[in-house]
Amino acid sequence: MAKLIVALDYTYASEALAMANILKKHVEWVKVGLELFTHEGPSIIQLLKRMGFKVMLDLKLFDIPNTVKGSVRSACLMDVDMLTLHILGGEHMIKAALNEVQSSIQKKSHSPLLFGVTILTSIKQGELPGYNQDIASMVLNLAAYGQQWGLHGIVCSGQELTKIKALYPSLSCLTPGIRMSYSQKDDQHRVMTPSEAVKAGSDFLVIGRPITQAEQPIKIVEDIISSIM
């Protein structure tokens, strides 16, 4: 069964922890993104882990190999369960990150799953100057590299899932841009409902505002889980 990851897209720890406290008996995974992590630092990870959550640290790392390697080492020390990085960072960057995870395993330390970002779900066709390929083709090419280089999984929109799973059935796929049929798209463009994404082959669904901005977030979580079972 696909896993639900609730995106705690807040600025302050107080807001994120308040929502986490509401959801802690109903959700296994939460996501900490760039805004919250930049404001609160590693302490927010520690607090969420103490509450019993598995934590996806969504920093979308994209830097020189040595810098990314050091960032992955820090994530391992924070007991992060999943970490994102851009596949466009290239083979040397990806393999430096994977080597650091392997080193953590050998030291019997905590080691996160590494998921490679393909193309952000907020990007529409024509918004990438200098790239002549259509978005779907770019995502498929990046997924191929992610598989080849040994990533644990990739991040892609629901619209590319079916083709990716047909080509790489063992590659885990994490899908952001998930919206309920009745909810707004917000700043997402390539979106899909939870049941559609699971039918297409998604292994992890990242959902934020449709849950965290709802009057009854637990009810929305229950509806989502029911729709993907």
UniProtKB/Swiss-Prot annotation:
Pathway: Pyrimidine metabolism; UMP biosynthesis via de novo pathway; UMP from orotate: step 2/2
Gene: pyrF
Family note: Belongs to the OMP decarboxylase family. Type 1 subfamily.
The reaction(s) this protein catalyses: orotidine 5'-phosphate + H(+) = UMP + CO2
Enzyme class: lyase
Family matches, as InterPro entries: Aldolase_TIM, OMPdecase, OMPdecase_AS, OMPdecase_bac, OMPdeCOase_dom, RibuloseP-bd_barrel
A Gene Ontology molecular function term of the record: orotidine-5'-phosphate decarboxylase activity
Superkingdom: Bacteria
Residues annotated for substrate binding in this entry: 9, 31, 58-67, 121, 179, 188, 208-209
Function per UniProt: Catalyzes the decarboxylation of orotidine 5'-monophosphate (OMP) to uridine 5'-monophosphate (UMP).
Annotated GO biological process: 'de novo' pyrimidine nucleobase biosynthetic process; 'de novo' UMP biosynthetic process
Protein known as: Orotidine 5'-phosphate decarboxylase
Pfam families named in the record: OMPdecase
Higher taxonomy: Bacteria, Pseudomonadati, Thermodesulfobacteriota, Desulfovibrionia, Desulfovibrionales
Active site: K60 (proton donor)
Quaternary assembly: Homodimer.
GO CC terms of this entry: cytosol
PANTHER family associated with the record: OROTIDINE 5'-PHOSPHATE DECARBOXYLASE
Keyword Lyase (UniProt): yes
Keywords: Decarboxylase, Lyase, Pyrimidine biosynthesis
SMART domains referenced in this protein's UniProt entry, alphabetically: OMPdecase
E.C. designation(s): 4.1.1.23
Organism: Lawsonia intracellularis (strain PHE/MN1-00)
